[in-house]
């Protein structure tokens, strides 16, 4: 039975311990800021206060007290009124308040400041706190302030310099600081003005360079457009060598007869003109494949000259037709230059540009004639190969040259230079139809 009774009384022990701890915590929490709990009396007791010139060492209050709690004297330049206050620093009359020291401070009392230093004054409507005792420089004082009358002479008299050194008054220090700030502001203004002027100069130089490098108007729109273009075409034709039309004779005696001829025939002006006419016919018709340039033996050159002499009568009729059509194209070309002067290619109708783009494509000729395409036209405008490689057709080229500032007459001039008179004729006809201008009367083509 006793064993059973011990088991029934054991659960009450934790409850008793918890209740005692809660009651002790309640006693500690009832103590004030400067009180500690006395376990002997079970009451809150006041912490021992410190005397003047002393401050508490360690902590005491709110029910707790350090074992080594006590009071220690204040260090130098600090004071305390006693009680539970810590030591505080004396007023810095000269450094902070800009005033004279009336009474120096000690361990029990604070320092007392007197009147303002020379060159400083106190505000009349000052706040009623510690900042109301601050003195301000006479440089910022309103006129007729009595403390600042004769501040310059008084400041220099009250602050004499020591032997071998010079001492500036507070008034002179303030004046020096303000003058330094003024010089800094002036330097900043000059620097900003210089940067602004340089930026404007750079912009003007860039604009002048752009205007200077802008392409000028084409020569086709001058007083004699047809003649200038014709001269340009003739110059391009002269730079190219005439293709050698080589004829291989089967008769052996005829070949030996030609090789035995001592006199070498010379080309006449009619032969040279016929060769140029053949080149122009390839550009207009775009259906003949030019023969590759070859450098053979003297016998082959003689054969070529003989062949040209035999075909002189046959090519004369064809050259007359080519010249007639060439003159017609140049007349229409000159008329179009005057109509669309200053317009860009993208201002033309879409169908007109698309038709010209198809004519300049590499798949335009069914017989695979070797003619200049829109890529050659792009090279004549000075575009780089990587830029041309990013294009797919002539429409993109027209957009590119329009963005670069080229006009329709310049486009026609480039087409003439690359020997695409067929494209020039088609584009001029579409432009005249779009502009509502009657084309010049054309002569009938001569039979070729």
Curated annotation (Swiss-Prot):
Residue ranges of TNFR-Cys repeats: 30-71, 73-113, 115-148
Region entry Disordered, spans: 220-297
Topological relation to the membrane, as annotated: Single-pass type I membrane protein
Superkingdom to which the source organism belongs: Eukaryota
Keywords annotated in UniProt: Apoptosis, Developmental protein, Differentiation, Disease variant, Disulfide bond, Ectodermal dysplasia, Glycoprotein, Membrane, Receptor, Repeat, Signal, Transmembrane, Transmembrane helix
Residues in the signal sequence: 1-26
Biased composition range(s): Polar residues: 271-283
SUPFAM superfamilies documented for this protein: DEATH domain (SSF47986)
Cytoplasmic side: 209-448
InterPro entries from the UniProt entry: DEATH-like_dom_sf, Death_EDAR, EDAR_N, TNR19/27/EDAR
PANTHER family to which the protein is assigned, alphabetical: TNFR-CYS DOMAIN-CONTAINING PROTEIN, TUMOR NECROSIS FACTOR RECEPTOR SUPERFAMILY MEMBER EDAR
Subunit structure as annotated in this protein's UniProt entry: Binds to EDARADD. Associates with TRAF1, TRAF2, TRAF3 and NIK.
Disease linked to the protein: Ectodermal dysplasia 10A, hypohidrotic/hair/nail type, autosomal dominant: A form of ectodermal dysplasia, a heterogeneous group of disorders due to abnormal development of two or more ectodermal structures. It is an autosomal dominant condition characterized by hypotrichosis, abnormal or missing teeth, and hypohidrosis due to the absence of sweat glands. Ectodermal dysplasia 10B, hypohidrotic/hair/tooth type, autosomal recessive: A disorder due to abnormal development of two or more ectodermal structures, and characterized by sparse hair (atrichosis or hypotrichosis), abnormal or missing teeth and the inability to sweat due to the absence of sweat glands.
Protein name: Tumor necrosis factor receptor superfamily member EDAR
Gene name linked to the record: EDAR
